[in-house]
Structure formats: structure tokens, C-alpha cells
């Protein structure tokens, strides 16, 4: 029998999910009186939003209505370009985001780059072993500074040769002799807050507390990013030593939230859309636990073990969603993570990274077969998500309803509303 468990959740949620106060930032910097202003600039100073229009879209979903009587957010949340731009500022730039893995910066001078919304970043480990994160933008004329990943002793801009140390300081500015009121010390890279928890490297787009930035403590990250779910995730082996295997990327013609919704339907779609996966799971054991900004779905393994003994799912599976766009899947000897990156109101990229028990890291046949099965499931989800996006564009659809098993999805929408409300 399917069960739903409820752990600690924020005060603003409806009664069926209601619990503690004070977990979220107040975002007071976004405060605005709609009666006094028709427009207001938010986090990104280059972007202006019509407050009245955004406010109307946000209030079309009411988080105080319990799931049993609630409607889903309107289709405009998934299609409107203005809503999408506002969403980037309010949802993605205020909290921790998992953007990479500690193995990517294992040694001094290692670095990797990425993009979150319209923010390009670079993460590196300097010569003294300290981890830094910066906006990946040259201070001279805004060229993107680094690309890809690898190892460098410094960052040299390909445009005009300005050179930065791995600690972000500008150490060389070409052809600046004679320029007045210019100081190398004032033109370093703009820092970002960076943290490491288990195998994950996390960023906050909000400005670092000091010019050089600081690596946050494990305790702070656990509190802000994972809340009270950290114990259950550790128990499930999420932070255990695993070997990194590979990365797969899927570009999908759907809003980023469509992919998240699909993940958060409590296994509802599995019997209908994933016949192969279903045979390896015992859906009668499916359960859901809701935390502050995390929901965990768990399911026992089924009877699918090949005649050759092949079994990638094991005896139980744990699927954790970390708001707003990160999934951690722990099953058998495997862990894979899914980072959902918005590319526009109707497009996203999902980055899958695969980790494996070290005892199996050299078993090429097992790895190949496991990845093939995983890819089959992902392509089934791609088809579903793109189909949903087309339906959301239809004049025939505006809002839907929740099934009882879709509590994680409803929780996700309540969290979105909390970040988006004016």
C-alpha cells in the first residue's frame, strides 16, 4: 500500500504540509508596494518586470488550498516569457545550487565552468588548496573568461590578455599604462559564495560576503540547502564515497518545471510510461516524505533480476528532489544526479551525472548495460515532457488537478509560490 509521510515543512504551506517557521530567507530586498509602483527593478538590474502582470500570474495559484481541493498552477507559469525572466531572479539566484562535484576540483589548479540562468561561473581550487567561485566575466570588457574544465595556473582573457590569479585577483592588465584612477586591486573577478557538501559543489549567485569569498561550513550548507532531510540522505548513502563514471545531457523542448513535475508525481506515471523500470520496482511500497525544501520518494526493488544476475536497481531506490532544480537518485550500487537548467520558457537542459560503487567501476559490461537502461527511461521522459509542453500551449488547457500521490509536486509548487509572491 502506498504511504505518505510528512516531516518538517515551512509555515506558509497549507495545513496538510504545515510546520516550522523561519526556514526561508525573507527576501525583503524584493519588497514592493504594488499600489504605489507599476514597475520595479529586481535582482538583475538590466531586467524590468511589470509588477501587476507578474503578481496576477503568481496569485492564480493558492498554496493555502490543500492538495485535495487545489488546482495546479496555470499554464502561463510554463509559457510566459516575462514570468520566466522574473522566475530566474526570484527562484534561482537566492539559494544554494548544486553545480558540480568535488572530484572536478580535486587537485590544486583544477577548475570547471558552467551557466545557471544567465549567470556564467567558474569554480577553481587555488595553489593553496582553497576553493573559489567567480562570475566568469572579465572585468575589462565583459568577455567570458574561461571555458570547459581542466587545470590552469591562471585565467587569461582571450580578448585582450588580462590575467587573473586563481584567487580572483587581477595580476596583469595589458596596455593600461597612462590610464588614470585605475588599480589592479579594484578590478578582480566578482566572487560567488561556494560550498561543498559530500560530493557536491554548490553556489549562491548572491554576492560573497568578502572580496575573496569563503567556503561555507558543512553545517551551514546542510541547514540552508537540505534542512532536516540531511540525516535521511546520509542514511541513504548520498554522501558515501562513490566513483564518478560519466555525464549525459538531454536538451528538452519544455519548461524546466515540466521536467520537475514529472519527477515529482509520486511514481504515478511509472506503470504507464516506464514498463521496463516498473518491473524492477515494487510500487506497493512507494512512500513519500516531505521536508522543508526537499522531498524524498522511496520504493522497494521488484523481481527484475536477469538470468545473468544483472540488477542495477538493487533492493530499494531513493529519489530526492532538492528545490528548486536538483534530483539525487540512489539505487543499488548507483547514484545519479539530475541538474535541470532553464534555457528559456519552453526549453531546458538536464545534466545527468553517474556515480558507482568503487568495487564496480571497472566492470565495463555492467556500466554499459546500466547506462543503456537509464537512457531508455530518460528518453521516455523526454517524450512525456515535450508532449506536456505542447499541451500547455493549447487554448484548451489552463489548470489541472492533483492526485493524492502527487504531494511532492504540490509541495514544489508551494515553494515556487513562496519565492515568487510580491
UniProtKB/Swiss-Prot annotation:
Could you say which residues bind [2Fe-2S] cluster here?
138, 140, 157, 160
Record: transit peptide: 1-47
Q: Which InterPro entries does the UniProt record give?
A: Rieske_2Fe-2S (IPR017941), Rieske_2Fe-2S_sf (IPR036922), Ring_hydroxy_dOase_asu_C_dom (IPR015879), Rng_hydr_dOase-A (IPR001663)
State the source organism's domain of life. Eukaryota
EC number(s) from the headed UniProt entry:
1.14.15.7
Which UniProt keyword terms apply here? 2Fe-2S, Chloroplast, Iron, Iron-sulfur, Magnesium, Metal-binding, Monooxygenase, Oxidoreductase, Plastid, Transit peptide
The reaction(s) catalysed by this protein are: choline + 2 reduced [2Fe-2S]-[ferredoxin] + O2 + 2 H(+) = betaine aldehyde hydrate + 2 oxidized [2Fe-2S]-[ferredoxin] + H2O
Q: Which GO terms describe its molecular function?
A: 2 iron, 2 sulfur cluster binding; choline monooxygenase activity; iron ion binding
Q: Which CDD domains match?
A: RHO_alpha_C_CMO-like, Rieske_RO_Alpha_CMO
Q: How is the cofactor bound?
A: Binds 1 [2Fe-2S] cluster.
Tell me the protein's name. Choline monooxygenase, chloroplastic
